[in-house]
Amino acid sequence: ESCLSYELLECMATPIPPHSNALQSSNLWNSSREIKIFPEMTYKELVGNHGIQTWLENIQRVGFVLVKNTPATAEATKELMERIAYIRSSIFGGFSVWDNKLETPDDTAFTSLAIEPHTDGTYLHDAPGLQTLHCIQRDAEGGNNQLIDGLAIAETMRKKYPEAFEILCNINIPGRYIKTDTYLQAYRPVFRVNDDGEV
């Protein structure tokens, strides 16, 4: 049995921090013109300890960072990612390298087609929170990508179409991944809100 004084417990108690949702993007945007400071950093900045805080703040601020001058190797990309998080294993392995050299591609990730706005991992029970894309070698035309702010879309829907927003917060929608030897499925609402109503 332990006996601790009130004074010791009070001294060791951690004060309750002011509420903040570290995952909530602080600057919602609908076009690149709305981003006041475009988040660009160099690989050299990020491998040094001084750049990590700015990197994470930029991710929190607008949801992404464009990293320039990264060595054209998967190893350099992996090393960079492991500076801020662990790499989660999935059906594709721990760290995936994709190319467009398949004979019969059945996924736009393997082609030179532009990838339309979408959400990855909806078929996983624990979808990715942060994803990294690095074009190591480019010898074809096309394959352009675009980024969208899903949180801005959710907030626009909440304001303009509140009934639709509520439906998308409360109805589970199936996400599926179907291949010859793989079938994954998870059900979840399109939007999720926390106890404070934040998406």
How should each PLM-predicted stretch be described?
Residues 1-26:
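Hydrophobic, ordered structural segments
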Residues 26-64, 69-199:
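Active-site environment of non-heme Fe oxygenases that use a 2-His-1-carboxylate facial triad
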